[in-house]
């Protein structure tokens, strides 16, 4: 039209769209494009892409699809492909950026070299893969292969169904597991790990901190280099180990190897229990370690499962206003305990004729 109501035939200018019919489908493509470099236009498709090489797949070939950029492909119904070398082949999928591919139904791939293959999946960033249905992979080199899984950060892997891996090189392979931080592993079902180089191997286990390990089911390891290997065990502090079932090790370099044993303090003495997962009256129930190093291990107090107790050191009993201190050494034959009236009790030789 000349703007005055006069309409006449004219040559379309470069860059304008023209209606074309190919293979019984009618859509729209930029004027002047070499048809040998494109697949047949899709019904109501809009092809704004540019292709220099012969192809039967480039462009907007799906129904109501849109292709933009260089060597892009929108091949299924309602697809959108934008950028360089992107391909949207899943129905209602979107591929944007550089060499991205969206093959899953209503999937989205954005960034560089990303792949969204699962239905309703999303891959964003660089070299990410969203393989599982409804999965999400974001960042650099992340993989989300589990159902409804999420991988975020750098080099993370969420392979368990409903799992989440976040941070740097974390792995969440257990069902509904969560791995966060750097190089952490959550392999147990419903497990969680946080921090650096920590691992939660047991089902329903939790490992937090630095180099911690929770390998027992329903176990918890926290702190620095702690290990909770017994079922329902807890290890906290520094280099503590709870290997008995339902055991607890807290403090520094403490060990709780028997069932329901609790060890606190530092560097308690080691022993071999009879029952790791069963009750034995000769095993320890509670121990307070007061050792100073791995070469100087000792115990301030030991309570055994039969109730017998060993106290290494003086024992002071107090009612708040008065107190007495019992000696921690044995007397000689014939000696008795005596008091000086000030709360100090010691071994003394009984006077002649005393009862």
Residue ranges of model-derived segments:
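Periodic small-residue-enriched repeat registers in elongated scaffold domains
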Residues: 15-312
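Extracellular repetitive beta-rich solenoid segments
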Residues: 1-14, 279-309, 313-353
């Amino acid at each position: 039209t000349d703007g005055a109501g006069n309409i006449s035939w004219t040559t379309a200018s470069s860059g304008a769209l023209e209606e074309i019919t190919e293979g019984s489908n009618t859509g729209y493509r930029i004027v002047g494009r070499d048809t040998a470099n494109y697949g047949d236009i899709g019904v109501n498709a809009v092809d704004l892409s540019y292709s220099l090489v012969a192809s039967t797949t480039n462009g907007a070939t799906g129904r109501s699809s849109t292709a933009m950029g260089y060597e892009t492909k929108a091949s299924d119904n309602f697809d959108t492909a934008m950028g360089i070398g992107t391909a949207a082949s899943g129905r209602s999928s979107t591929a944007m950026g550089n060499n991205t591919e969206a093959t899953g139904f209503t999937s989205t791939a954005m960034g560089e070299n990303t792949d969204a293959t699962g239905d309703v999946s999303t891959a964003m960033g660089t070299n990410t893969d969203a393989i599982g249905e409804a999965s999400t992979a974001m960042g650099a080199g992340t993989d989300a292969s589990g159902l409804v899984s999420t991988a975020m950060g750098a080099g993370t892997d969420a392979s368990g169904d409903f799992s989440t891996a976040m941070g740097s090189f974390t792995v969440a392979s257990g069902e509904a597991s969560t791995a966060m931080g750097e190089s952490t592993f959550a392999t147990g079902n419903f497990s969680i790990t946080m921090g650096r180089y920590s691992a939660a191997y047991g089902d329903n286990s939790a490992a937090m901190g630095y180099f911690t390990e929770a390998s027992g089911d329903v176990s918890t390891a926290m702190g620095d280099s702690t290990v909770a290997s017994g079922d329902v065990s807890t290890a906290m502090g520094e280099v503590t180990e709870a290997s008995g079932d339902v055991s607890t090790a807290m403090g520094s370099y403490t060990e709780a190897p028997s069932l329901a044993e609790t060890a606190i303090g530092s560097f308690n003495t080691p022993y071999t229990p009879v029952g790791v997962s069963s009750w034995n009256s000769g095993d320890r129930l509670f121990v307070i370690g007061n050792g100073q190093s791995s070469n100087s291990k000792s115990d301030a107090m030991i309570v055994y499962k039969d109730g017998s107790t060993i106290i290494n050191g003086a024992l002071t009993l107090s009612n708040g206003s008065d107190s007495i201190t019992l000696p921690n050494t044995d007397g000689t034959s014939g000696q008795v305990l005596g008091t000086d009236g000030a709360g100090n009790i010691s071994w003394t030789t009984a006077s002649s004729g005393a009862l």
